[in-house]
Amino acid sequence: MELDMVPVTIESLAIRMMPQPSVLSLRPSKALAIPGEENDEVYDHVLPIWIGPAEAAAIASAIDKSRSERPLTHSMVAQLVRSMGGSVNRCVIDRVNGTTFYATIYVRCANGMFTRVDARPSDAVALAIRADAPLFVASNVLKAASFPRSFKPGADLKLEMEEFHKFVEGVNPEDFVTEGD
């Protein structure tokens, strides 16, 4: 069953040390939306996902295109897929249960067939960046776990981000438990 998927980009990444979780915030991308769907209410939302500091560091390293003397895990996985004639087709955050998000990495194999790999969202995001693959979130996940975006067009982005980070510091993952949990 194919999910209704919404293209997303990284809104922000707040890296914190334990015991506080780091927060990855994803924002639906109107620029990447299917024409006609960019006015859907989910495009004015942000999806916070709590991750560990090591996972946040891996995403930050991918965003910054940092190079290391030896390949990091996500770079190695992307290289492994390419060396076998495949490609990372897309990464999808496709499910949420309470405060736990789930992702699927879609790999196009050398024979043209696709295979799906279960992944943590943090790994899917880090790999998508390293493999230059699109990132999506299932619309039902956005509707269940996202929040209206408080940023206003033309607003001071730095001030808005500071306010968002203050908001993030005052919440816990349990604040985002979805119905039925």
Task: Indicate where each model-derived feature is located.
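Divalent-cation
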Residues: M1-D181
